[in-house]
């Protein structure tokens, strides 16, 4: 059983530091890839956060790791750029990731997903183009991001989709843009947004 052993200012600092570390990791990753001129797209929870921020700052959620999508031919350049910046490359069960310390948790990592790879038995990952440019960084178009979230459809993906539904970013008109089973997954969330 977990008990409160960390309290007071130490607890506040720990909670704030966790969020700030993720934000710094995202900014550092983007700066490295931009400087190296390696094509990429921020995906996952941070891409959702960027889209949600366009509508309601209070609705944003953070996520533990940073996910980027790159083309397989650019992976060597990503490895070179990230390791030159002091990050440690690791490949765990086929997933390339970068951590700040060799013994760091995969939760504290930058995960690199490859265009064309099939994740969790779904569709192949999309290309990074067409892209959406958010001034300082690149992400995928909203339609592509929604498709990726419908494809993965883990609980956290469902929550991200529900956040976008609750803000009106996604509505019933989106369902016809996707083939089954993705359309059915979206309709499931639209029909019962409270679970």
Residue ranges and their predicted role:
Residues 1-195:
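Compositionally biased terminal segments of proteins
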